[in-house]
Amino acid sequence: MALQLIDLNSDVQYITIDVSRVPYTFSVKLTDRTYSFTVKYNATGKFFTIDLYDVNGNVLTFGEIVRYGRPLFNVVEDERFPIPVIIPSCITGDSISEVTWENFGKDVKLYLHERKVE
């Protein structure tokens, strides 16, 4: 399955992450729904996690590890989850293979990809 970056008015869309605020929670509207994301950092394992909540504060996913190039929330999907596919990646051509404190939110962003429904 090929994924296409969502392209509106030639702007590549992504969810902004500010590692200087971690741990923190923010809301974002994706397609027709608003979600809350809580971004945390596990200093021992050196990885980020994201908790996903619906507009009513119900937990959809807890402790999802942010892995470079792997779609978030891909293990369990149903109609409550975001329509776009969210993939942590770098589109600058740099050779990055993991999400780190130094690159997350800067070079590595949570890019939105069009979900192909077949």
Predicted regions and their residues:
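C-terminal charged interaction modules
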Residues: 97-118
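Short, isolated positions in well-ordered beta-strands
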Residues: 35-36, 60
